[in-house]
A protein has these predicted regions:
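Single-stranded nucleic acid-binding surfaces, predominantly the OB-fold ssDNA-binding core
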Residues: 1-97
Length: 97
């Protein structure tokens, strides 16, 4: 998706799981079109080696971003069935505006 404004870059998160070390970083992006009164916002998570791409952008930049969407289903402790959508980033670059 093109013409997105970087609204917020979240801190790097790291940890260790059964499969080894992991890292991720989330970025909040917003549609950058002045004609839209209420622009959509997207929370995109970059993981593993893709985390380094976030270093090339800063808050306020206009970027293009590519992601895949995944829905994760789960059950709460009280038994309710829930679902959450995740946007997994696989490419982000600053646009020449």
């Amino acid at each position: 998706m093109d013409n997105l404004k970087v609204k917020k870059i979240m801190p790097l998160q790291t940890g260790v799981s059964e499969r080894g070390e992991w890292k991720s970083r989330e970025v909040i992006l917003e549609e950058n079109d002045e004609r839209i009164q209420y622009p959509n916002q997207y929370l995109v998570r970059f993981t593993a080696d893709r985390v380094n791409q976030v270093d090339s952008i800063k808050e306020g930049d206009t970027v293009s971003c590519h992601w895949s969407s995944r829905v994760r289903e789960y059950r709460t402790k009280d038994g309710r069935e829930m679902a959450a959508q995740e946007l997994n980033g696989w490419g982000v670059k600053k646009e020449n505006v």
